Amino acid sequence: MSNPIKIGIGGPVGAGKTQLIEKVVKRLAKKMSIGVITNDIYTKEDEKILVNTGVLPEDRIIGVETGGCPHTAIREDASMNFAAIDELLERNDDIELIFIESGGDNLAATFSPELVDFSIYIIDVAQGEKIPRKGGQGMIKSDFFIINKTDLAPYVGASLDQMAKDTEVFRGNHPFAFTNLKTDEGLEKVIEWIEHDVLLKGLT
């Protein structure tokens, strides 16, 4: 059984977590063996969405119904996600990379370091310019931070320059990117980070 690298994807409901996974997997699946675990509270909606996109065979995607606080399932009691990892590897023992998508949660959500090797936290511009200024452990502690849906900035009166400045205050030199995943704008920076900072470090 392989020992895959695991990347956690966290962020509020509707920020673009599932779409991010779809776009990234579509690019990387030609180069390596990938699996995905999604977390929803009472459904397996995100699993269905990814299956319907066809980015991966159905046996490489597992949906977890957390049945409660999504934060607990990725940190305090991640047993359901550990079980899902085992099931994925039983189905496909060649998997090299697993994405674990959390259920939509607040700015404080972080992944257990025992569950994932790296984490990405994503918000969207529509939540307001002030979000990066509020900080939050999800944004501060993540290895990579994404501000998605940049196309909405004019409609909600958000300054991307101000959001960038506020992000740098909390994250310092740690990487982040602006994206519009609908058009793939900014996606390349995310891919480059995964290929160079995650895969190269994780495989050494």
Swiss-Prot record:
GO cellular component, one term: cytoplasm
InterPro entries, sorted: CobW/HypB/UreG_nucleotide-bd, P-loop_NTPase, UreG
GO molecular function: GTP binding; GTPase activity; nickel cation binding
Positions of transmembrane segments: none
SUPFAM superfamilies (UniProt xref): P-loop containing nucleoside triphosphate hydrolases
Compartments where located: Cytoplasm
One of the Pfam families matching this protein, by short name: cobW
Binding site for GTP: G11, P12, V13, G14, A15, G16, K17, T18
GO biological process: urea catabolic process
Gene3D superfamilies found in the cross-reference section: P-loop containing nucleotide triphosphate hydrolases (3.40.50.300)
Alphabetical keyword list: Chaperone, Cytoplasm, GTP-binding, Nickel insertion, Nucleotide-binding
NCBIfam families, per database record: ureG (TIGR00101)
Job of this protein: Facilitates the functional incorporation of the urease nickel metallocenter. This process requires GTP hydrolysis, probably effectuated by UreG.
Family under the similarity heading: Belongs to the SIMIBI class G3E GTPase family. UreG subfamily.
The protein's assembly and partners: Homodimer. UreD, UreF and UreG form a complex that acts as a GTP-hydrolysis-dependent molecular chaperone, activating the urease apoprotein by helping to assemble the nickel containing metallocenter of UreC. The UreE protein probably delivers the nickel.
HAMAP family the record matches: UreG (MF_01389)
Protein name: Urease accessory protein UreG
